[in-house]
Regions:
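C-terminal motif of bacterial Sec signal peptides marking the signal peptidase cleavage site
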Residues: 11-14
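Early extracytoplasmic/lumenal segment of secretory-pathway proteins
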Residues: 16-90
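Extracytoplasmic ligand-binding site segments that recognize negatively charged/polar headgroups
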Residues: 33-40, 75-215
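A ligand-binding cleft/hinge motif common to bilobed small-molecule-binding domains
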Residues: 86-90, 212, 216-235, 284
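Periplasmic-binding protein-like
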Residues: 125, 189-194, 200-201, 232-258, ...
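A bilobed periplasmic-binding-protein/Venus flytrap-type ligand-binding module shared by bacterial periplasmic
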Residues: 130-135, 175, 248-263, 279-280
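An extracytoplasmic/periplasmic, membrane-proximal ligand-sensing/linker region
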Residues: 184-185, 290-334
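Mature extracytoplasmic/periplasmic domains
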Residues: 255-309
C-alpha cells in the first residue's frame, strides 16, 4: 500500500493530530512504534504545544525499520518515535538517521542515548509476564514466576507473544534467553518456549490484549501494556520473572532526508523534554522516563535493584540480531 493511501486511511481513522485543516509545509509524518494510544498522545501533545499537525503511521519496531530501509528513494517520514533502541542502532549504522544534538539531551544519561546524537532514549519498560489468574487456576497449575515455568505442559497453547521478526518486544525476550543461558542452551529453551505459543502476533503490544480477551493464560510483554489492560478492567496481573528480566530503551530519531527537518528537530526537542516524556501517560500506559530529573526514572530504577535485570550491552544485542532471527525463521517458522 502506498504511503499516500496509508496516510489517508490514518486520517480517516483518527490517527492524526491535524484536525480538519490541510497539512502545511511545517506538518510532520511520524513513524511510531508504540501502542496506538501512546502514539496519539504524543502527536496530540506536540500539536497542542506547537500548532503543527502530525500524521502518524504505526508499525512494530522491526517492520518500521524495514519501511525506513525501503523508503530511501522517496522519504515518507520525518521522525521515528518508539521501539527498542537496538533497531535504532542498526538504522544509525546504515546512515538512515540524521544526527541532532537537542538541548534537552542533557537531561538524559549518556547510557540511554547515542554518542553521535543520532537517537535518544525517551522511555523504558520492564519485560514481564501478563497472566490471567483464573485461567491459570482453571488449567490446574500455578502462576508462572520464572522463565522455566513457561515450559509447564499445562501451558501448551496458552502463551501469547509477538514474533521477534516484527517486534522489538519479542526480540528483547529472545535476546534475554541467550544472556541467561548461553547461545546453545538459550536456543534450546526458545525452541521449547515457542512450541507453547498459541499464535505469534505482529506487535509486542498485542499479547496483553490476547490474554485480556481470554484467548490465552499468559503473555510475554512489557509491563505497562499489562498494567493498562488491568486498569481498563481486565482480570490480569503483572508478574516480573524472578530469575531474570530485561528492559527496553524506547527511542526517538530524526530520519535522514526528512522532508521537514526544522519541524522534526522541534519534535525531538519536545520528545526529549520532561513534558514530552510525560505525554504518553495520558494514554493510560505509564512507561518509565529516561530523564534524570523525573521521578521513577530508568537510572534510579536500575540502581535500586528491585528487578533482576541481566543482559548484554546494547551493541551486542544489536549485533546478534540477524543470526538469531535467521535461526528463528529456519527453526520456528518453517
Amino acid at each position: 500500500m502506498g504511503a499516500l493511501v496509508v496516510l489517508a486511511l490514518l486520517a480517516l481513522t483518527g490517527c492524526t493530530a491535524t484536525g480538519d485543516r490541510q497539512m502545511d509545509d511545517r506538518d510532520l509524518a511520524v513513524l511510531c512504534s508504540n501502542d496506538a494510544e501512546v502514539c496519539r498522545a504524543w502527536a496530540g501533545a506536540f500539536t497542542e504545544r506547537t500548532g503543527y499537525g502530525v500524521t502518524t503511521v504505526r508499525l512494530p519496531t522491526s517492520e518500521a525499520l524495514e519501511r525506513i530501509r525501503h523508503g530511501e528513494d522517496l522519504p515518507e517520514f520525518d521522525v521515528w518515535h518508539g521501539g527498542g533502541s537496538e533497531m535504532y542502532v542498526e538504522a544509525a549504522d546504515e546512515g538512515l538517521l540524521a544526527p541532532y544534538r537537542s538541548a534537552q539531551a542533557a537531561g538524559i544519561p549518556e547510557d540511554f542515548r547515542d554518542p553521535e546524537d543520532r537517537w535518544s532514549g525517551v522511555y523504558s519498560s520492564m519485560l514481564a509476564f501478563c497472566v490471567a489468574p483464573q485461567a491459570i487456576s482453571d488449567l490446574g497449575t500455578d502462576i508462572p514466576r520464572t522463565w522455566d515455568d513457561l515450559l509447564d505442559p499445562a501451558l501448551d497453547g496458552q502463551i501469547s507473544t509477538a514474533s521477534p521478526r516484527t517486534s522489538g518486544t519479542a526480540y528483547t525476550a529472545m535476546s534475554l534467553q541467550i544472556d541467561r543461558l548461553g547461545e546453545d542452551a538459550g536456543r534450546e529453551y526458545l525452541a521449547g518456549l515457542y512450541g507453547q505459543v498459541l499464535q505469534f502476533t505482529r506487535s509486542g503490544t498485542a499479547p496483553a490484549q490476547v490474554v485480556a480477551r481470554g484467548e490465552t493464560a499468559v503473555a510475554i510483554t512489557f509491563a505497562p501494556y499489562c498494567e493498562a489492560a488491568r486498569a481498563a478492567g481486565s482480570h490480569v496481573e503483572v508478574v516480573l520473572p524472578e530469575d531474570a528480566t530485561s528492559y527496553e530503551i524506547g527511542a526517538v530519531a530524526m530520519l535522514a532526508d526528512a522532508p521537514h527537518p526544522g519541524t522534526a528537530r522541534e519534535y525531538l526537542d519536545f520528545a526529549l523534554s520532561a513534558d514530552g516524556q510525560r505525554a504518553g501517560a495520558a494514554s493510560g500506559i505509564d512507561q518509565i522516563p529516561t530523564r534524570s530529573d523525573l521521578p521513577g526514572n530508568l537510572a534510579d530504577v536500575l540502581a535500586d535493584g528491585r528487578y533482576p535485570v541481566i543482559g548484554a550491552s546494547l551493541a551486542e544485542r544489536s549485533s546478534r540480531r540477524d543470526a538469531l532471527l535467521a535461526w528463528y525463521t529456519e527453526e520456528v517458522e518453517r
